[in-house]
């Protein structure tokens, strides 16, 4: 399982102590955004697997917004954000094409 990290020594300088306080806040904010990102991506992928085109499109728009936010804040590199959006978009688009082809075959 995961082992606890060894405790770091406290900084001596005031600027170092302030930096530690800031890091704790930033870490919490970044972790929250990453979690939001993972949840959004999973929701889009679930909708695609379920074959729900409208829901997938709606969730993709929300996921796209979250990915852009994370990229703007510098949590993810802009290229990673673009790559993730592209892959999700391809899945949603493939679902839409599949939905269009299915009625004509039946």
From Swiss-Prot:
<dbReference type="InterPro" id="IPR002583">
    <property type="entry name" value="Ribosomal_bS20"/>
</dbReference>
<dbReference type="GO" id="GO:0003735">
    <property type="term" value="F:structural constituent of ribosome"/>
</dbReference>
<feature type="region of interest" description="Disordered">
    <location>
        <begin position="1"/>
        <end position="21"/>
    </location>
</feature>
<comment type="function">
    <text>Binds directly to 16S ribosomal RNA.</text>
</comment>
<keyword id="KW-0694">RNA-binding</keyword>
<feature type="compositionally biased region" description="Basic residues">
    <location>
        <begin position="1"/>
        <end position="20"/>
    </location>
</feature>
<dbReference type="GO" id="GO:0006412">
    <property type="term" value="P:translation"/>
</dbReference>
<dbReference type="InterPro" id="IPR036510">
    <property type="entry name" value="Ribosomal_bS20_sf"/>
</dbReference>
<comment type="similarity">
    <text>Belongs to the bacterial ribosomal protein bS20 family.</text>
</comment>
<keyword id="KW-0699">rRNA-binding</keyword>
<keyword id="KW-0689">Ribosomal protein</keyword>
<keyword id="KW-0687">Ribonucleoprotein</keyword>
<protein>
    <recommendedName>
        <fullName>Small ribosomal subunit protein bS20</fullName>
    </recommendedName>
</protein>
<dbReference type="GO" id="GO:0015935">
    <property type="term" value="C:small ribosomal subunit"/>
</dbReference>
<dbReference type="GO" id="GO:0070181">
    <property type="term" value="F:small ribosomal subunit rRNA binding"/>
</dbReference>
<dbReference type="Pfam" id="PF01649">
    <property type="entry name" value="Ribosomal_S20p"/>
</dbReference>
<dbReference type="GO" id="GO:0005829">
    <property type="term" value="C:cytosol"/>
</dbReference>
């Amino acid at each position: 399982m995961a082992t606890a990290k060894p405790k770091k020594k406290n900084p001596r300088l005031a600027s170092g102590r302030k930096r530690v306080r800031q890091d704790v806040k930033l870490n919490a904010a970044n972790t929250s955004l990453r979690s939001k990102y993972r949840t959004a991506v999973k929701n889009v992928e679930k909708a695609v697997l379920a074959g729900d085109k409208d829901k997938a499109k709606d969730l993709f728009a929300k996921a796209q917004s979250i990915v852009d936010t994370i990229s703007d804040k510098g949590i993810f590199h802009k290229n990673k954000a673009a790559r993730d959006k592209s892959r999700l978009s391809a899945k949603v688009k493939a679902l839409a094409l599949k939905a269009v082809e299915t009625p004509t075959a039946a």
